[in-house]
């Protein structure tokens, strides 16, 4: 049976050809290799039509133009040559579109990303809607790749090399007005007139490319270009620590095209695309993409979720304010905050105001939309307005009696169907639900700070939580724009449990004489966004170390931290960034300066700060403990799958995405190698490095956690 066409041609009475893109049976338009023959057949008809005046590409999907190329195509390539051929096929197709003798216009509504933007760049003009769903970008770098269908060559010539490099190197997505300002699109119109406006543009001569700004013209010359690539190369190397080969290749390919001409540029682009597709970094990043897509589809349980019409929040602190913001402004749900202190409510409201006002200032949001979203948030010092809330999120202090009291109050003041979700980071959910009259409606919903930025949430059912409560809480987390993983109700849950030994080991190395900045730099070089000591300063030393006794009580001495160090630091009133006193020095607010370690830290912990370990040795000690604990969590069914374990670590603590998560990283090293490293470390530093039983068994049998493909588990 012949596949239904994703591209259909309709020539209007005014001799404008409208090519409608609608991939059958899919919510999103993505480009597949097999569509090339369909497009070529249409191009042949267009060339033969001597009456033709212009061509318009438009999508039939309600919220996307083309979301990119189908990533599975890359996974199907076995060699760099096959992936290179895929890129050349894309380049050729775009060249044929560009070579049409009449004006070709892309009418863009919704996401226009990756191969979708490359198709739009091959057109002679672009028009897009002013809808918030409309975004344009080349996100291939986030998959360890570069744009392979001409994007590295066309974009710099259209909008200037420095602006294009920023887009391609970061995967940054532009809104309609930004795209217009930069010259990426020729006009922005309401969705209702998009097609007609594009048709009118197609009836005119080809849109002439607007002159580049003076700065971009200077940077396009040999001297300016040399300076630009040197500066951008340095900045990129600092940011990626050399862990992402795609960024280096992007710079190389763009420079080749500008220095040697487009023909050499296209050759370099296709070759680099093929080689990058085979790198372990790209394979790991693609695996994270597939895993996060799967997690977002996972309902959490087999039961249907209950309706969600409104939410309540207990506690107007930093977490409560952040949760209120994502509930109202991302999920679009009315939210009511209860705090015993009116000041707490004011803080929570101000938090949302600050977030939204920032968007208004950056012109990402209209003032009227800011006001509409803020109107969804209200506050109270009692339970008025809570009677019919579907779900209550508790974000009060980490105190078991207080949280149990909150459960009792919610059961007394809210409806019989109301779910109680605790944002605890360390207390067992079963204990919080111990005196509940409806324990099946009590669950953990653990957000990470800052709430609006951290993509992960842990959903923690206790033994008596109902399947519907799980499904409803997962549904809310997704509405809030989060990636939820369901974890078992054991001390530390998953993320904090694997993070604690990593941070403990960093503190232990401090006591051995390693310097703060050396430890942090070693882990940043390894691929973490910040080092463990800086992370402790950011989350709060008091908050970050509070969980250690809980974990030590549950799992034994492998979780013990050098107690004298922690107490010495806390007794010196050092809580980190929040009180301006931590391991690092904090200047006046608003001043940006390079982080400096507070030299008073070393006498406080009784060392000179004269370390002996190399950066790889420092990283090895911290990371191996994290890997070992992640495997224990899988063994104890704290996480449901290695997929959830990898996603939890990457999205929850910034485990290096180019390594694919703890389980994929163990696979890349081999279980045998991990066991050998840990046994060596156990001999040197003690029994906390003893590899867990499952790793030892896997090393004997030569097993791995993942199969070879990006999405399959063993």
From Swiss-Prot:
Q: Which reaction does it catalyse?
A: a (3S)-3-hydroxyacyl-CoA = a (2E)-enoyl-CoA + H2O; a 4-saturated-(3S)-3-hydroxyacyl-CoA = a (3E)-enoyl-CoA + H2O; a (3S)-3-hydroxyacyl-CoA + NAD(+) = a 3-oxoacyl-CoA + NADH + H(+); (3S)-3-hydroxybutanoyl-CoA = (3R)-3-hydroxybutanoyl-CoA
Location of the protein in the cell: Cytoplasm
Q: What does this protein do?
A: Catalyzes the formation of a hydroxyacyl-CoA by addition of water on enoyl-CoA. Also exhibits 3-hydroxyacyl-CoA epimerase and 3-hydroxyacyl-CoA dehydrogenase activities.
Please name the taxonomic classification of the source: Bacteria, Pseudomonadati, Pseudomonadota, Gammaproteobacteria, Enterobacterales
GO CC term, one of those recorded: cytoplasm
This one is known as Fatty acid oxidation complex subunit alpha
Q: Which gene encodes it?
A: fadJ
Q: What is its EC number?
A: 4.2.1.17, 5.1.2.3, 1.1.1.35
Give the family this protein belongs to, as stated in its UniProt record.
In the N-terminal section; belongs to the enoyl-CoA hydratase/isomerase family. In the central section; belongs to the 3-hydroxyacyl-CoA dehydrogenase family.
Please cite one Gene Ontology biological process associated with this protein: fatty acid beta-oxidation
Q: Which InterPro entries match?
A: 3-OHacyl-CoA_DH_CS, 3-OHacyl-CoA_DH_NAD-bd, 3HC_DH_C, 6-PGluconate_DH-like_C_sf, ClpP/crotonase-like_dom_sf, Enoyl-CoA_hydra/iso, FA_oxidation_alpha_subunit, FadJ
The alphabetized UniProt keywords are: Cytoplasm, Fatty acid metabolism, Isomerase, Lipid degradation, Lipid metabolism, Lyase, Multifunctional enzyme, NAD, Oxidoreductase
Against Pfam families, the record matches this protein to: 3HCDH, 3HCDH_N, ECH_1
Q: Which PANTHER family match?
A: TRIFUNCTIONAL ENZYME SUBUNIT ALPHA, TRIFUNCTIONAL ENZYME SUBUNIT ALPHA, MITOCHONDRIAL
